[in-house]
């Protein structure tokens, strides 16, 4: 007796917004035919806080504590772009020592961000062992941050014209010790992960993006460099003092999840090289120049004058943003983080447009997961590396 064939019904599954592998409050509406993904629709906005509108009602210094809540795992970069925008707009020069300190902090933050990507990414694939080794090294970076800035996260360390405080005594030696130790840690990760046959089965050939597709979708960072495009803003559009260091852009041509993993692991080693060179070359001198500039404006001010000590020092240094516009960008761990700033001869920005790398990189997700298996969604989403704080803003 033959049973009549019935048409299979498609299944619609909600993944998130409270799924442990969603890396934040991301919701995916997935249409399945058995285990095969037919369609995927990301739903964003659960973490929208109006960051661009808040900026239009604050001075830059007042706004600085807010920006660490975009990408809260790489806060040095959000601070850097926030102070770079008015510095470029008003042509404010920063001391060489402050620029070197910024580079050191940015590269430490890049390593911490990549580590915090790698640990959960491996856990998503079912590999729990590397997670604990990775967080061991990340803890050392946070100890360095705490010693220099007073905070493990949300540092609020960068200032217009420099940084908030100089490096404490003995900090540079501890940082060099960490660099030597961490290079051995990267080798350990590669031995544990890179040649693991189960890991390779899960990531090799999964989530392929060609170089042309990557450019057309506006991807940046490791997503772009893993598809054969050697584009790193630290090389092609140098900022701070990156043009004074010798390092190589990490890239792969395969364009799959494995290539994105290899790019990020390679970047951690290159970041250590940059930090070591910056520490070796770091000059003496002031760590910020804004107080000196404000002091010189007052003809009759004295260093021990009442007005300078109590009225000039305590409030935020305010200055008007001239009627100009510019776009400034940095190479964040997840890609190109940019700010489009429009001044209006007032203390507040007239327009503060954020270009978050995670939001733009996430747009290609539905195309990548179609015709893949349900289990591959976590691999592909993890390889993109998103933080919903900067995606939703």
Swiss-Prot record:
GO CC terms of this entry: chloroplast thylakoid membrane
Pfam families named in the record: Complex1_49kDa (PF00346)
InterPro entries for this protein: NADH_Q_OxRdtase_suD, NADH_UbQ_OxRdtase_49kDa_CS, NDH1_su_D/H, NiFe-Hase_large
Keyword NAD: yes
Keyword Plastid: yes
Gene Ontology MF annotations: NAD binding; oxidoreductase activity, acting on NAD(P)H, quinone or similar compound as acceptor; quinone binding
EC number annotated for this UniProt entry: 7.1.1.-
Predominant cellular place of this UniProt entry's protein: plastid
GO biological process: photosynthesis, light reaction
Topology term for the membrane: Peripheral membrane protein
Catalytic activity: a plastoquinone + NADH + (n+1) H(+)(in) = a plastoquinol + NAD(+) + n H(+)(out); a plastoquinone + NADPH + (n+1) H(+)(in) = a plastoquinol + NADP(+) + n H(+)(out)
Entries under Gene3D superfamilies matching the protein: Cytochrome-c3 Hydrogenase, chain B (1.10.645.10)
Enzyme kind, highest EC tier: translocase
Keywords in alphabetical order: Chloroplast, Membrane, NAD, NADP, Plastid, Plastoquinone, Quinone, Thylakoid, Translocase, Transport
Compartments reported by the entry: Plastid, Chloroplast thylakoid membrane
Function comment: NDH shuttles electrons from NAD(P)H:plastoquinone, via FMN and iron-sulfur (Fe-S) centers, to quinones in the photosynthetic chain and possibly in a chloroplast respiratory chain. The immediate electron acceptor for the enzyme in this species is believed to be plastoquinone. Couples the redox reaction to proton translocation, and thus conserves the redox energy in a proton gradient.
Family to which the UniProt record says this protein belongs: Belongs to the complex I 49 kDa subunit family.
HAMAP family per record: NDH1_NuoD
Quaternary structure note: NDH is composed of at least 16 different subunits, 5 of which are encoded in the nucleus.
Name used for this protein in its record: NAD(P)H-quinone oxidoreductase subunit H, chloroplastic
Protein's organism: Hordeum vulgare
Lineage: Eukaryota, Viridiplantae, Streptophyta, Embryophyta, Tracheophyta
């Amino acid at each position: 007796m033959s049973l009549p064939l019935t048409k299979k019904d498609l299944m619609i599954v909600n993944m998130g917004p409270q799924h442990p592998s969603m890396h934040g409050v991301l919701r995916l509406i997935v249409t399945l035919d058995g285990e095969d993904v037919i369609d995927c629709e990301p739903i964003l906005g659960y973490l929208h806080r109006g960051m661009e509108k808040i900026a239009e009602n604050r001075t830059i210094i007042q706004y600085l504590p807010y920006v660490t809540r975009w990408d809260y795992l790489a806060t040095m970069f959000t601070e850097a772009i926030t102070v770079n925008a008015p510095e470029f707009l008003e042509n404010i020069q920063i001391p060489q020592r402050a620029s070197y300190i910024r580079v050191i902090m940015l590269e430490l933050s890049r390593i911490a961000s990549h580590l915090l990507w790698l640990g959960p990414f491996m856990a998503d694939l079912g590999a729990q062992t590397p997670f604990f080794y990775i967080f061991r090294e990340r803890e050392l970076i946070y100890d360095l941050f705490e010693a220099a800035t007073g905070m493990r996260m949300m540092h609020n360390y960068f200032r217009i014209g420099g940084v908030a405080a100089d490096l404490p005594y003995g900090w540079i030696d501890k940082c060099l010790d960490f660099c030597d130790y961490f290079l051995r840690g990267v080798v350990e990760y590669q031995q544990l992960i890179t040649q693991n046959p189960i890991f390779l089965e899960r990531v090799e050939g999964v989530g392929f993006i060609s170089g042309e597709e990557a450019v057309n979708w506006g991807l940046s960072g490791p997503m772009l460099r893993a598809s054969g495009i050697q584009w790193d803003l630290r090389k092609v559009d140098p900022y701070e003092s990156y043009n004074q260091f010798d390092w190589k852009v990490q890239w792969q041509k395969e364009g799959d999840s494995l290539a994105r993993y290899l790019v990020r692991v390679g970047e951690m080693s290159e970041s250590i090289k940059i930090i070591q060179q910056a520490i070796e070359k770091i000059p003496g001198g002031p760590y910020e120049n804004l107080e000196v500039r404000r002091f010189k404006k007052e003809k009759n001010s004295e260093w021990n004058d009442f007005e300078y000590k109590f009225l000039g020092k305590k409030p935020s240094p305010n200055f008007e943003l001239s009627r100009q516009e510019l776009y400034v960008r940095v190479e964040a761990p997840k890609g190109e983080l940019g700010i489009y700033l429009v001044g209006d001869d007032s203390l507040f920005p007239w327009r503060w447009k954020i270009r978050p790398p995670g939001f733009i990189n996430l747009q290609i997700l539905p195309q990548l997961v179609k015709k893949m298996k349900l289990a591959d969604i976590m691999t592909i989403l993890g390889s993109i590396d998103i933080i919903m704080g900067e995606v939703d803003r």
